[in-house]
Design a protein with these regions (language model features):
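Conserved alpha-helical substructure of the radical SAM core
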Residues: 1-121, 132-145, 149, 158
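Flexible mid-to-C-terminal extensions adjoining Fe-S/redox cofactors in radical SAM and related proteins
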Residues: 1-7, 27, 267, 274, ...
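N-terminal [4Fe-4S]-dependent radical SAM core
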Residues: 1-10, 57-59, 246-260, 329-333
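Conserved C-terminal portion of the radical SAM core fold
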Residues: 8, 12, 55-68, 88-95, ...
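Residues immediately within or flanking Cys/His clusters that coordinate Zn2+
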Residues: 14, 18, 256, 320-323
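Short catalytic/ligand-binding loop motif for oxyanion handling, primarily in non-cytosolic enzymes
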Residues: 20, 30-33, 74-76, 104-105, ...
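Short, cysteine/histidine-rich loop/knuckle motifs that typically chelate Zn2+
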Residues: 23, 261, 325
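Short, small/polar residue-rich loop motifs at catalytic or cofactor-binding pockets
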Residues: 261-269
Length: 333
C-alpha cells in the first residue's frame, strides 16, 4: 500500500513538439511515436474526475495544478479550447510552456478567455538572433519574426486584463557556471553548439540583454542549469552530467534512495503522477521513451494503479537504473 498522496500531476495530451531544441532529446530522437496522439476530451475528463473524486483519499485535497508539458507543445493540441473548458469545470489550473511559434492570435484569444485556469505562461526561446534561433530550435528562420510578433501581440492583449496572466521568457543556455569544474552540474560534449561561455560578456548574457531590448517590460531570465534527463543527451554527445553526479551525489551513499526532482513537490517517484497521451502512467519525465510504465488510467482506476505493487516495483527498479543517471536523485545507503 502506498502511504503517499498524489500531490502533483503531469498530463501530456498530445505527445508532439514542432521544435527541436538542441538541449532536448526530441532534437535527436524525435517524439516517441508510440505516444503521439491527441487524447480525446472524454479521456481527459475521465482523469480529472478520478483526481477530483480522489481528493482527501489518494489525492492531496489541495491539488489544483495539472501540468500540461512533457516533451510536447501543448498549443498544438487540436481541442485546446475545449480542454481548457475541462480545466475550468474541475477547478484545475495549468502552466503553459510554449516555443511561441504557435502562440497565434487565435490561441491568444483562447488563453485570455481561460485566464482563470492559467497560472502562468513560460516561453522557451533560446536566442534573440534569427539565424541562431533557427539553429538552436531546428525551425525555419522565416518563423522567427512571426514568433516575436506572437509574443508582442499576447503581451498587448494580456495587459488589457485587470489581472494579467504572468508570462516569463526563459533563455535556456550555457555559461561557465554551468560546468562541473565551476560548481555547475554539466559538461559539454563534442556535438554541443559552440558558444562563448563567459558569464559577463558571453552568448547567454548577450541574449538576455537583446531580449530586454525587444521586450523591455517582460519578465526574462537565463537558465544555465540545463539537465540531461537520465543521460539521453550524453548518448548523442551533447552534454553529460556524469562527472557532476560522481562529484556531488555519489559520495552520499552507494545507491539511489529517493528523488528531489519535482517542481514545488519534490519527489517525482512518491508524490507525482506522469501520464502520457495513451493514459499510461510512468515514473518521471526523465523517462523519455516510456520504459517505466506501471499502469494505465483507463484500464485500471488511478487509485488502484497508485496503490499497486507494479508501481512500487517500478520505483525500485528505476532507483537501480534510470535514476542513477539523474542529477535529481538522492543517494544514500
Amino acid at each position: 500500500m502506498n502511504s503517499y498522496q498524489i500531490k502533483a500531476v503531469q498530463l501530456d495530451v498530445n505527445g508532439i513538439c514542432n521544435s527541436s531544441c538542441w538541449f532536448c532529446p526530441v532534437a535527436y530522437a524525435g517524439n516517441p511515436k508510440s505516444a503521439i496522439r491527441d487524447m480525446p476530451l472524454e479521456e481527459i475528463e475521465n482523469i480529472f474526475i478520478q483526481l477530483t473524486n480522489g481528493k482527501g483519499d489518494f489525492v492531496d485535497p489541495d491539488l489544483s495544478l495539472v501540468y500540461s508539458a512533457n516533451y510536447n507543445e501543448i498549443l498544438l493540441y487540436k481541442e485546446f479550447d475545449s480542454m481548457m473548458d475541462l480545466y475550468a469545470k474541475y477547478n484545475f489550473k495549468t502552466n503553459i510552456l510554449t516555443n511561441a511559434v504557435n502562440l497565434t492570435k487565435s490561441k491568444t484569444e483562447i488563453l485570455i478567455k481561460h485566464r482563470n485556469s492559467i497560472q502562468g505562461i513560460l516561453l522557451n526561446v533560446p536566442s534573440s538572433n534569427p539565424e541562431t534561433w533557427s539553429k538552436y530550435v531546428g525551425m525555419n528562420v522565416k518563423l522567427f519574426p512571426k514568433m516575436i510578433n506572437n509574443i508582442k501581440y499576447f503581451i498587448e492583449e494580456n495587459n488589457k486584463l485587470e489581472n494579467p496572466i504572468f508570462i516569463h521568457l526563459m533563455i535556456n543556455g550555457i555559461n561557465e557556471l554551468s560546468l562541473t569544474k565551476n560548481g555547475g552540474w554539466l559538461d559539454l560534449l563534442q556535438n554541443a553548439p559552440k558558444m562563448d561561455l563567459k558569464v559577463q560578456t558571453g552568448d547567454l548574457k548577450k541574449e538576455h540583454d537583446r531580449f530586454k531590448e525587444i521586450f523591455p517590460d517582460l519578465s526574462i531570465s537565463t537558465a544555465h542549469h540545463l539537465y540531461d534527463r537520465a543521460a539521453h543527451l550524453e548518448t548523442y554527445n551533447i552534454m553529460t552530467q556524469g562527472p557532476a553526479i560522481e562529484k556531488y551525489l555519489k559520495p552520499n551513499g552507494s545507491r539511489v534512495v529517493g528523488c528531489n526532482g519535482g517542481l514545488g513537490v519534490r519527489s517525482r517517484t512518491n508524490e507525482w503522477i506522469h501520464i502520457n497521451p495513451n493514459g499510461d502512467l510512468f515514473i518521471c519525465c526523465a523517462d523519455f521513451d516510456f520504459e517505466t510504465i506501471y499502469g494505465n488510467a483507463f484500464k485500471t482506476s488511478l487509485k488502484e494503479v497508485w496503490h499497486s505493487r507494479a508501481r512500487v516495483d517500478m520505483v525500485n527498479e528505476s532507483y537501480t537504473k534510470m535514476c542513477t543517471d539523474c542529477s535529481a536523485a538522492i543517494w544514500g545507503n
